């Protein structure tokens, strides 16, 4: 399989937010969507370079319950980005 990266992203969406599922289905290029329950799904794909998916994956921040990838670089980069965003924009107890 030419060293494909396997990626899985579990996404939760609230009541009335089915548009998230529709968006995921519409925008995915490869892979499949598994429905886990009424408000949770998993996107699964095997791609040549999962790091190229990071900008798209980031658009689901706040809804991602779990992210796994055979390329640990992708997972580490995603969570490091979250830590950087929290350091820049959040975490202050006196924030407005």
Region locations from a protein language model:
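Polybasic (Lys/Arg-rich)
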Residues: 1-96
């Amino acid at each position: 399989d030419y060293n494909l990266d396997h990626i899985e992203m579990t996404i939760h969406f609230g009541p009335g937010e089915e548009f998230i599922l529709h968006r995921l289905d519409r925008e995915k290029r490869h892979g499949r969507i598994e429905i886990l329950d009424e408000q949770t799904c998993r996107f699964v794909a095997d791609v040549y370079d999962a790091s190229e998916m990071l900008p798209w994956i980031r658009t689901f921040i706040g809804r991602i319950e779990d992210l796994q990838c055979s390329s640990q670089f992708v997972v580490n980069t995603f969570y490091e980005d979250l830590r950087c965003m929290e350091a820049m924009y959040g975490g202050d107890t006196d924030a407005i």
